[in-house]
Amino acid sequence: MAERSQTAPEAGNDTGNEDAIGGNVNKYIVLPNGYSGQPKKGHLTFDACFESGNLGRVEQVSDFEYDLFIRPDTCNPRFRVWFNFTVENVKELQRVIFNIVNFSKTKSLYRDGMAPMVKSTSRPKWQRLPPKNVYYYRCPDHRKNYVMSFAFCFDREDDIYQFAYCYPYTYTRFQHYLDSLQKKNMDYFFREQLGQSVQQRQLDLLTITSPENLREGSEKKVIFITGRVHPGETPSSFVCQGIIDFLVSQHPIARVLREHLVFKIAPMLNPDGVYLGNYRCSLMGFDLNRHWLDPSPWAHPTLHGVKQLIIKMYNDPKTSLEFYIDIHAHSTMMNGFMYGNIFEDEERFQRQSIFPKLLCQNAEDFSYTSTSFNRDAVKAGTGRRFLGGLLDHSSYCYTLEVSFYSYIIGGTTAAVPYTEEAYMKLGRNVARTFLDYYRLNSLVEKIAVPMPRLRSKEERRLGWEHPSCLRAEQPLEVLGIPMCSGKALNEHLGNDIQWHLDCGSSTLPLGLISCSPSSSASWNDMAMSNSILLPDHSFH
C-alpha cells in the first residue's frame, strides 16, 4: 500500500527535474494525510502499469483535487505529452478534478476545445469528455506553466475508469489485427518480419498487390507507407488501418489498385515506444524521425531495416518507388494535411501538389490550405526530407498529418471531433486517391445498384460512404462551469458538475459534404493549365 507522495520538484514545460518520476504508478492508492487504516471507497487507486500506459506521479491537493504528472519518454525527459491511466476504488457520485501539470508543450489543441478520452469497464467505448469540463491555463502554482484540468464525476463504484490523451492503439492490438488478416489467406496480402526492435518486438512489413506483380522480372510501381514512428501519435495507426482495410477489401477500386500497384506498408516503426507508452521516442530515448541519415542497426534497428529495404528497391531497375508517405498526428492543428519537399525543378515541385489536391477532393477532412512544402532545417533527418533527396524526380515523399482532435468542413467554422472511424475513413480516402492520381477510373466496373441507407458494419468500414452512413458520437448533455485557475475550479465544483459516461451507444447521422480544394487551383484547373502537365502513368 502506498501513501500519498510528499512534495517533489516540479517540472516545467520545457525543462524541469523529472528525476522523481522513474516509472509508471502501479496500483497507487492515494490516502489522506495522517490516515493509517485500510483504504475505503473513495480513496482513489491510480494505475498505468499496462501496455501504452503513462502516469508517473500523483499528488493529492485537496479532498477532491489531484495533480497528475506525465512520465517522460524513456531515457528522454524532454517529451511529456501522452497519458493513459486507470482509476478505481471510486465512490458513487464522487467528484474530482485532475490536473495534468507537466506537459512539455505549451501550444495545445486543448485551447481549441479538445478534451481527454474516457471509458469504463461497463462502457468500453471511448468517449471524449465534454469540453465545458476541460480547462487549459497558466497556473501560478506550477511556475506559470500550462496545466490541463478536467472535472469528472464517477457514477459506478464497481467500474474501473480509464483516461487517455487520445484513442489508444497498442502494439498488441496491432498484432491481433495483422493476425486476423493473415488467417484469411488472401493471395494478395503478404506479411513478413523485416526486423526486430531493441526489445525484440516485431517490425512488420506488409505487401498488398496482385501476385502477378511479384513475379521475378516484372516491373513494379511501389507505394511505400510508414506509420507510428512517434509512438504517442495513435491516430497514425487508425489511418494506416483504414488504408490496409480498404486495399485488402473486395471494393472494385481496391481490386484495380492491387492489379496495377504494389503497396509496401510498415505500419509501426517504433513498437517499443508504443508498448512503453512514450510520446515521441524509442526505448533508448531517440526520436527515430531524426535519424534517417545514418540509422544505427543496434540503436535504431527498425529504422535501419526500413531504410535498407527502400535503398534496395531504389537500386532495382525493375522497381519504380513512386510514393513515400509517413503518417503522423499533429497536436496543435486541425484537419488532415501534408508536408512536402521543395525542389529546384519547378515542374517537379508543381507535380507533387497534385496528390494532396486530389486527396482534398476525396476527403472532406483534408485541408490543402494547411498543406505546405518546405526545407525546414529542424526537419532534417526525417523520412520525408532524406528520401526526398535520395529518390529520383519521379518519386514524391510526404508526411501525412492528422489532428489529434478535429477537422473543420469547408464552408463552416464548427470543429468536428475525430473518431476512430473518422481516422480510418481518412485512410480509405488516401488509398482511393491513388486511383485518381494514376487515372485508373475507367477500369473500375460501374455498379448501378442504389446505395442502401443502412448497411452492414463491414460495408460501412470498408466501402464508399453514403451521407446517411457517416456517423458521429451524439453530443452529450452536460453542465459546464467557468474557471481560469485551479482555485476557481474548487470554488465552482459544487453540485453542478455531474458528468457520467454515456450509457448508450446512440449515434447521430451527419451530412457528408464534398470537399473542394481550398486553393484557387483545383485539379481541373491544373489539368488545363499551361504551366503544369498531368503526370503520365502509363501501364504496359
Swiss-Prot record:
Changing E233Q: Abolishes deglutamylase activity. Widely expressed. Expressed abundantly in testis, pituitary and brain and to a lower extent in eye, stomach, adrenal and kidney. In brain, expressed at low level in cerebellum as compared to cortex. Disulfide bonds: none annotated. Residues 167-438 form the Peptidase M14 domain. Pfam families: Pepdidase_M14_N (PF18027), Peptidase_M14 (PF00246). Its cofactor is Zn(2+). The active site is at E401 (proton donor/acceptor). Binds 1 zinc ion per subunit. The keyword GTP-binding does not apply. Its main location: cytoplasm. It is an enzyme of class 3 (hydrolase). GO terms for molecular function: metallocarboxypeptidase activity; tubulin binding; zinc ion binding. Zn(2+) binds at H230, E233, H328. InterPro entries: Cytosolic_carboxypeptidase, Pepdidase_M14_N, Peptidase_M14. One of its GO terms (cellular component) is centriole. SUPFAM superfamilies: Zn-dependent exopeptidases. Belongs to the peptidase M14 family. Interacts with MYLK. This is Cytosolic carboxypeptidase 6. The gene is Agbl4.
